[in-house]
Amino acid sequence: MLKYRGLENKNVLVIGLAKSGYEAAKLLNKLGANVIVNDGKDLSQDAHAIDLENEGIKVIGGEHPLSLLDSHPIIVKNPGIPYTVPLIEAAVEKGLTILTEVELSYLISEAPIIGVTGTNGKTTVTSLIGDMFQKSRVTGKLSGNIGYVASKVAQEVTADDYLVTELSSFQLLGIDQYKPHIAIITNIYSAHLDYHETLDNYQNAKKQIYKNQTENDYLICNYHQRHLIESETLRAKTYYFSTQQEVDGIYVKDDYIVFKGFRIIHKDDLVLPGEHNLENILAAVLAALLSGISVKAIIDSLTSFSGIEHRLQYIGTNKTNKYYNDSKATNTLATQFALDSFKQPIIWLCGGLDRGNDFDELIPHMKNVRMMVAFGETKEKFIKLGESQGKYVITANDVQDAVDKIQSVIEPNDVVLLSPACASWDQYNTFEERGNKFIKSFQANLPSF
């Protein structure tokens, strides 16, 4: 950790406790700042708040008094708190510096940063890069929006490590000097407009990731969205990825992933399914190569990495049948991606909480569905949907029952896909619980030797 002195004796107001606010406050205190933590909820019984007070940090909960701005503090804001909160609006009017916690991770760390952002795929890309580091002699640690507070992890790495950080648009709005050595933008679509108000605002937040990069840094982005990158403000060396054509970067040709004419791996050897995941894989492989990770380590990762839990997660093979857990697919769009990810016949496990949705928009994506197993409140809707398309449909009481019932009708090379297109709350407390029940049922049906 660098002995950063830029905040020594400075007044700093941390707005929003949570995990990131707690770690930021502890770090700021260690750096010699005069720290106050503020949160809109009552913190009188909060364990983190009590711990901070025991360290001599002032904590104010239950309201956001405007008097907190009287000392003209630097503000470290929880990224989830919108700029429309009166305290933040007043800080903007006063011209106060407003940062997010990831800025602190950059200020104190000598480790080169791989920053990953984008509307879709950033968690998969970040996790896959992390897996490649684990299989390599080069060391890297995950941080950021993926669940590991960046300012805490930054204290644990050295100049010989990489800090692999998932970055949301909310976090990127609050950076000043933050500079990743390798920046990745997976894609940019319309999202979070309730927070950003306009698509331009959202896109500009994402572009913050490369604003401080120099010619010694790298930007990796989707070739087919290159028009969104503002070349006049870009100084980093730019590499592209594409699944459709040869580009200056990494691409797919003759079903191989290719970098600078070198074939790395065939598509059929990848564990992660789907065209969208192929784009994620290209971005991760390119970042790994630029970080000095060996091709062997990259291949080891690509042939074993099963994905993020409950997100089109490969959980194993029984005889010739691969099973995929996509329990996080709680809406039709996510299930469309899942159904489009396979060329093999699919046994599709579907259903859950009835929110009044119409599932007809799934019809164009059902061509590879051989059989459906419907359960939950939406069972009857999925029966009707399947029968309208001439699909074989059976019903089950729940996910576990569905896995049991398909054992007598499954055919060689069928893919078994849990992608409910519905929330889980009619039968399970969370989508994680539903996914874990699916995994246990798969394991229970494995042959014993």
UniProtKB/Swiss-Prot annotation:
It comes from the Bacteria. Coiled coil: none annotated. Keywords: ATP-binding, Cell cycle, Cell division, Cell shape, Cell wall biogenesis/degradation, Cytoplasm, Ligase, Nucleotide-binding, Peptidoglycan synthesis. It is an enzyme of class 6 (ligase). Pathway: Cell wall biogenesis; peptidoglycan biosynthesis. It is found in: Cytoplasm. One of its GO terms (molecular function) is ATP binding. It catalyses: UDP-N-acetyl-alpha-D-muramoyl-L-alanine + D-glutamate + ATP = UDP-N-acetyl-alpha-D-muramoyl-L-alanyl-D-glutamate + ADP + phosphate + H(+). The keyword Methyltransferase does not apply. ATP binds at G118, T119, N120, G121, K122, T123, T124. GO terms for biological process: cell division; cell wall organization; peptidoglycan biosynthetic process; regulation of cell shape. GO terms for cellular component: cytoplasm. Its main location: cytoplasm. InterPro entries: Mur-like_cat_sf (IPR036565), Mur_ligase_C (IPR004101), Mur_ligase_C_dom_sf (IPR036615), Mur_ligase_cen (IPR013221), MurD (IPR005762). Its EC number is 6.3.2.9. The keyword Metal-binding does not apply. SUPFAM superfamilies: MurCD N-terminal domain, MurD-like peptide ligases, catalytic domain, MurD-like peptide ligases, peptide-binding domain. Belongs to the MurCDEF family. Cell wall formation. Catalyzes the addition of glutamate to the nucleotide precursor UDP-N-acetylmuramoyl-L-alanine (UMA). This is UDP-N-acetylmuramoylalanine--D-glutamate ligase. It comes from Staphylococcus saprophyticus subsp. saprophyticus (strain ATCC 15305 / DSM 20229 / NCIMB 8711 / NCTC 7292 / S-41).
